[in-house]
């Protein structure tokens, strides 16, 4: 298995170096290697290994960085129209490189990607901001949410290469984006902040790339922010100890200062393996006009190969994150199949064959046949091309395909001639589909219709395939949707995108994790049944036991913050410490076994607060264990409010019920009769409050006399209230503001 240029089994003592390095020297080398960054003729030479005594050369000896003897030519100039791209000749696989950029949160992935785009001429120097963060929510939050692809043309040593760069998110909630991006890549740039070193998501992404057999190029970023040698030495030592990647393989960059970019591009061309695949035409309509049965046509048909392509992302024009075709030069109108808002745009990696417009492809799983209206690359907008050939990453437009009719991860194929059958097609190894871990009900805002919300969610799910959807019906809130997400941040981002891209304001119920139960009399091998407040079964109704999801949470934090985090994890979040390892003089790694419900309830926010933002957290797939669960129902005037039902531990039911009824009491308007508020577990009341009725002062005119005169008035008033309560028909009206306040009490 290839991991960069190192062997993981090589003894560590053979890889350690004894010299010291100054980050000032590294930055001076970066400046030297990029001194001609604006030159369109040649790239600067790196210093030779036999130089000694200079400020730039001795520090490089420690890392064994090979000097670059290649020259970088002028980048392909940007085009104002699509005509040059429509005639783009196919690149041989030997001149294609597919690379994904992965790293922990805020380690400089997007900034480095933008620096590469500017250095290669894809973006102009006047464009400010992070270009690959296209979504409004990405720019507002300052994080990458959707993986973005861009094709780059690089001329090196007189040869033109096509680099497909994929910028990925770093947050744990968006690992599905990273997984899909790695499936379409041949290598991964593993970025590490030189000042912060390896974090939890760094290792998660490293193992994800390692499992796929990808080449890994380690890169230290933000070198301009390093003020001493210690952080660099510590980061390099962490890389060796944790990943086995050699120091001499590490590349140094400063995207902010545009330093080290050429050396990085050279390393991508030299060290990333080219894609493997079969070249050839894949559909009869791709053949030139020849007489049927002619020797030339028969010879060309013999050389045809079936198309195989991996579909790893999709969107519609309404939720494409700003990806559009650029305006043609001179206001010309270019006809394209991408003009219809209902068309589906898919990102594909071509494994074998050729894909062109008008090619009819088949989805391997659903067996649905669709005609490609347009194909092209992203540079940095949608640029139509004549074809996509083996090894290339690009987009394909289909006409009015519903999102639920295909799955991201599908294999697209063709059978060009009769000698090929479906049995000859080997599906492209895609990526493991993930299961949602957090569920919440989405209800339309007052005055909105559920149909509009459902249509908006369906369109957004085309771009968010990890989100699941099921219909809901609540007497208090009306019709809604139960959506499943990969985490709390994923849910919040989805809600913000609904508002920003479709104008849908929604009421979101408290998020719950996926509980399960085992039916009575079932075998251990039988799959567990999902358990929600709508499908709840008591033990006497056929449930043998209930199960709760647990995860292993990995935290990397500074040593001075460990005690505070450990105390909170054990006291408030039912954590169980599995092990603790000292990484270096400043940091420790600790692993906890913790219920997923407690982690989603705010554990990560507490960790960030206690560590002043310096801790990182990662967690794996949930494992289900038995738990004493109950369902808490809330009754308002003896009518059950299903939107406020919640599943929790039996020991927590009284406190949760008390918070809910107290919130209702504080927000409900008093009426002429008492309103009882009850929280029940089965038939047992675990919490109760009463909204007292308004009372008229019936003794206001009685100023003297015996107390019995007042008591008679009070008794008459009490009997009247009882008669009024018996005549009351229907339940108390709860508007969404009252329900939202009560739902907020559940999440405390």
From Swiss-Prot:
Q: Know the name of this protein?
A: Translation factor GUF1 homolog 2, mitochondrial
Reaction(s) this enzyme catalyzes, per UniProt: GTP + H2O = GDP + phosphate + H(+)
| Database matches in InterPro entries | EF-4, EFG_III/V, EFG_V-like, LepA_C_sf, LepA_CTD, LepA_IV, P-loop_NTPase, Small_GTP-bd
List residues binding GTP.
Answer: 103-110, 167-171, 221-224
**PROSITE patterns xrefs:** G_TR_1, G_TR_2
EC number of this enzyme: 3.6.5.-
Q: What is the first-listed, main subcellular location in coarse terms?
A: mitochondrion
The UniProt entry's GO CC annotations, sorted and at most eight, read: mitochondrial inner membrane; mitochondrial matrix
Gene Ontology biological-process entries: positive regulation of translation; translation
The entry's family comment says: Belongs to the TRAFAC class translation factor GTPase superfamily. Classic translation factor GTPase family. LepA subfamily.
Record keywords, A-Z = GTP-binding, Hydrolase, Membrane, Mitochondrion, Mitochondrion inner membrane, Nucleotide-binding, Protein biosynthesis, Transit peptide
Q: Which GO terms describe its molecular function?
A: GTP binding; GTPase activity; mitochondrial ribosome binding
Which topology term describes how it sits in the membrane?
Answer: Peripheral membrane protein
Enzyme class comes to hydrolase
Locations listed in the record:
Mitochondrion inner membrane
Q: Where is the tr-type G domain?
A: 94-276
Known role: Promotes mitochondrial protein synthesis. May act as a fidelity factor of the translation reaction, by catalyzing a one-codon backward translocation of tRNAs on improperly translocated ribosomes. Binds to mitochondrial ribosomes in a GTP-dependent manner.
Q: Where is the transit peptide?
A: 1-29
């Amino acid at each position: 298995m290839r991991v960069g240029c190192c062997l993981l089994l090589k003894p560590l003592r053979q890889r350690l170096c004894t010299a010291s390095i100054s980050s000032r020297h590294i930055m001076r080398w970066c400046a030297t290697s990029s001194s001609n960054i604006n030159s369109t003729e040649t790239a600067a030479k790196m210093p030779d290994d036999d130089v000694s005594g200079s400020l730039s050369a001795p520090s490089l000896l420690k890392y064994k960085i090979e000097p670059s003897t290649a020259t970088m030519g002028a980048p392909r100039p940007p085009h104002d129209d699509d005509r040059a791209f429509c005639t783009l000749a196919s690149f041989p696989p030997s001149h294609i490189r597919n690379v994904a950029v992965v790293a922990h949160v805020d380690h400089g992935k997007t900034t480095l990607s933008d620096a590469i785009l500017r250095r290669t001429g894809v973006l102009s120097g006047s464009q400010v901001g992070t270009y690959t963060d296209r979504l409004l929510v990405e720019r507002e939050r300052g994080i990458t949410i959707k993986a973005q692809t861009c094709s780059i043309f690089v001329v090196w040593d007189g040869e033109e290469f096509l680099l497909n760069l994929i910028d990925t998110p770093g947050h744990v909630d968006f690992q599905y984006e990273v997984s899909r991006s790695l499936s379409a890549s041949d290598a991964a740039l593993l970025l590490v902040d030189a000042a912060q070193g390896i974090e939890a998501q760094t290792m998660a992404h490293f193992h994800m790339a390692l499992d796929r057999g990808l080449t890994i190029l380690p890169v230290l970023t933000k070198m301009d922010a390093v003020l001493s040698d210690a952080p660099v030495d510590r980061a390099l030592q962490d890389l060796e100890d944790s990943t086995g990647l050699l120091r001499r393989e590490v590349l140094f960059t400063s995207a902010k200062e545009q330093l080290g970019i050429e050396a990085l591009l050279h390393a991508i061309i030299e060290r990333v393996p080219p894609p493997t695949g079969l070249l050839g035409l894949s559909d009869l309509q791709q053949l030139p006009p020849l007489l049927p049965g002619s020797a030339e046509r028969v010879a060309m048909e013999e050389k045809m190969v079936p198309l195989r392509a991996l579909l790893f992302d999709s969107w519609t024009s309404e939720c494409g994150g700003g990806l559009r075709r650029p305006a043609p030069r001179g206001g010309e109108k270019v006809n394209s199949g991408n003009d219809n808002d209902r068309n589906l745009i898919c990102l594909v990696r071509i494994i074998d064959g050729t894909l062109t417009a008008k090619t009819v492809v088949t989805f391997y799983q659903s067996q649905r046949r669709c005609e490609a209206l347009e194909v092209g690359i992203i540079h940095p907008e949608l640029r139509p091309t004549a074809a996509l050939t083996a090894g290339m990453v690009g987009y394909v437009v289909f006409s009015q395909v519903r999102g639920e009719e295909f799955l991201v991860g599908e294999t697209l194929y063709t059978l060009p001639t009769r000698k090929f059958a479906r049995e000859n097609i080997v599906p492209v190894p895609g990526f493991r589909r993930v299961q949602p871990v957090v569920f919440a009900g989405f209800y339309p805002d007052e005055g909105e219709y559920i149909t509009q919300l459902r249509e908006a969610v369906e369109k957004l799910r085309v771009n968010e395939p990890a989100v699941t959807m099921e219909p809901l019906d609540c007497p208090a809130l009306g019709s809604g949707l139960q959506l499943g997400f990969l985490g709390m941040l994923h849910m919040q981002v989805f809600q913000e995108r609904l508002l920003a891209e479709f104008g849908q304001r929604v009421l979101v119920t408290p998020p719950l994790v996926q509980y399960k139960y085992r039916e009575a009399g079932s075998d251990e091998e039988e799959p567990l049944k999902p358990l929600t407040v709508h499908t709840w079964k008591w033990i006497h109704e056929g449930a043998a036991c209930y199960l709760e999801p647990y995860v292993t949470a990995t935290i990397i934090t500074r040593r001075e913050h460990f005690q505070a985090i450990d105390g909170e994890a054990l006291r408030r979040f039912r954590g169980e410490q599995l092990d603790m390892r000292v990484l270096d003089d400043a940091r420790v790694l600790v692993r906890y076994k913790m219920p997923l419900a407690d982690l989603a309830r705010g554990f990560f926010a507490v960790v960030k607060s206690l560590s002043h933002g310096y801790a990182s957290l990662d967690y794996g797939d949930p494992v289900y264990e038995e738990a004493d669960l109950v369902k808490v129902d809330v009754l308002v005037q003896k009518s059950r409010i299903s939107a406020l039902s919640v599943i929790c531990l039996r020991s927590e039911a009284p406190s949760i019920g008390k918070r809910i009824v107290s919130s209702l009491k504080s927000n409900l308007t008093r009426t002429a009769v008492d309103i009882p508020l009850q929280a029940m577990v089965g038939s047992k009341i675990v919490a109760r409050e009463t909204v007292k009725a308004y009372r008229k002062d019936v003794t206001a005119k009685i100023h003297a006399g015996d107390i019995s005169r007042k008591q008679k008035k009070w008794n008459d008033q009490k009997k009247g209230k009882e008669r009024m309560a018996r005549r009351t028909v229907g339940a108390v009206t709860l508007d969404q503001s009252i329900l939202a306040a009560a739902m907020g009490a559940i999440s405390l």
